[in-house]
């Protein structure tokens, strides 16, 4: 977020198309905490009904603490991309929650419980239906 919100243009497009707008913290410098905080502050001041897609794993790529990000941004979260990541070379890669430590659960508890959660990591195994059911059940019970 560079400071230019174009609130009337956004409001017009949201009204014209009748779809909700959610903004995700991506893996670039624009997905860091301060640009996201600035964006949602400006959106709130403009009374724009924009929510956040909180991608739990993308904070690895930006080098920021996801727990701190949750504290700063949880009130804006309307959707959660559930993802854990581990270092790979000079970057990161998404991993299954069973292969991650317990930190993802602690992070998820700091985010709104009533918003949709999407699995955003590779589902792998011989029985993908069973694997999918496993993770859906796991996320329902966190």
Segments predicted by a language model, with ranges:
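General secondary-structure edge motif
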Residues: 19-20, 50-53, 87, 91, ...
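Acidic (Asp/Glu)-rich catalytic clusters
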Residues: 7-18, 39-48, 68-78, 105-114, ...
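Active-site acidic/histidine proton-transfer and metal-coordination neighborhood
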Residues: 1-52, 61
